[in-house]
Structures are given as C-alpha cells and as structure tokens.
Amino acid sequence: MGNEFRVCDDCQATNIKTLIPKLKKIDSCASIEIGCQSYCGPGRKKSFAFVNNRPVAAPNEDELIKKIEAKLNK
C-alpha cells in the first residue's frame, strides 16, 4: 500500500503551492488529498500534514519536510 499525504488548503501556516511539490519529491506515487483536515488550532501556527493518517507538524515547512522524510524512512 502506498503512502498518503493529506494537507489543508485553508490553514494559515501551510502553503500548499510550495508544500505539494516537496511532498511529490519525497514520494511521487503517494496519494495527496487537499482539503480541511479539522486541525485548525495547530494549523494556525505550524506547518503540518497528515502522513498515513498521522499528524506531523513543525514550525516551518523545511522542518516539516525533514520530519516527514524521517517518518517514512523508519
């Protein structure tokens, strides 16, 4: 089963225009769902994505990508 990324297009700390290409670079075969993830509180202050149904958050997008890569390489 492939990886799944879910990101919000409405949260203030998440820029999907830059995040989506980075997620595709990590796993080009992963499914990517864009829409509200009901994670609004943390989404105001931190960049986040759900990776295989688990939330991953970081203060900025670069740190988020590092955390996602680490999570998938376990």
UniProtKB/Swiss-Prot annotation:
This is UPF0741 protein Bcer98_3905. It comes from Bacillus cytotoxicus (strain DSM 22905 / CIP 110041 / 391-98 / NVH 391-98). It comes from the Bacteria. Belongs to the UPF0741 family. InterPro entries: DUF1450, UPF0741.
